[in-house]
């Protein structure tokens, strides 16, 4: 089955579902690398992608944002001239009570009886003001880093903004 739209999982009203010892089918984490670029570089500017509202960000949205920002920064700045970090981890397991949509489906399924759902993916729960992505660059590459984070923000289902700070 295809993925549901991101708006189905954007908000949360239930406790986090994270206890992996009780979950039979554990969905994989889709993000292979959380740190990209040059982690040992001495950069003087830090740019942060901060979410404005609380919500959930699915792992595939985080991965899409990471790939988009990394590809842009690698092409424009170079692999050794930036450090990119995905600052949140998708701990929360998403569940879905799969329903059939065809003629005669009411005889085949139980509706809301035993509707706990099966695991379909992962999401990171974030609060308002929390950092989602972090980019460290030199002062001459600030514009490229801003553009990379702007493109990454378009992949995230929550409103966000970019904060520029001097590194310490």
UniProtKB/Swiss-Prot annotation:
Entries under Gene3D superfamilies matching the protein: Ribosomal protein L10e/L16
PROSITE patterns: RIBOSOMAL_L10E (PS01257)
InterPro entries for this protein: Ribosomal_uL16, Ribosomal_uL16_arc, Ribosomal_uL16_CS_euk_arc, Ribosomal_uL16_dom, Ribosomal_uL16_euk_arch, Ribosomal_uL16_sf
GO biological process terms on file: translation
Keyword Ribosomal protein annotated: yes
Keywords: Ribonucleoprotein, Ribosomal protein
Domain of life: Archaea
Entry GO terms, CC: ribonucleoprotein complex; ribosome
CDD domains for this protein: Ribosomal_L16_L10e (cd01433)
Molecular function, one GO term: structural constituent of ribosome
PANTHER family: 60S RIBOSOMAL PROTEIN L10 (PTHR11726)
Family according to the record: Belongs to the universal ribosomal protein uL16 family.
Name of the protein in its database record: Large ribosomal subunit protein uL16
Organism annotation: Thermofilum pendens (strain DSM 2475 / Hrk 5)
GN (gene name): rpl10e
């Amino acid at each position: 089955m295809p993925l549901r739209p991101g708006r189905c999982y954007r908000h949360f009203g239930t406790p986090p579902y994270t206890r992996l010892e009780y979950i039979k089918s554990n969905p994989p984490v889709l993000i292979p690398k959380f740190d990209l670029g040059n982690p040992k570089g001495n950069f003087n500017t830090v740019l942060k992608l901060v979410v404005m509202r609380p919500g959930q960000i699915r792992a595939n949205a985080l991965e899409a944002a990471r790939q988009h920002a990394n590809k842009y920064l690698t092409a424009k700045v170079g692999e050794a001239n930036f450090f990119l970090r995905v600052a949140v981890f998708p701990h929360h397991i998403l569940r879905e009570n799969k329903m059939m949509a065809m003629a005669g489906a009411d005889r085949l399924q139980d509706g809301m009886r035993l509707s706990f759902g099966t695991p379909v993916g992962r999401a990171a729960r974030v609060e308002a003001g929390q950092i989602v992505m972090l980019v460290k660059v030199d002062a001459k590459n600030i514009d490229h880093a801003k553009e990379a984070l702007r493109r990454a923000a378009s992949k995230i289902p929550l409103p966000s903004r970019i904060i520029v700070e001097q590194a310490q």
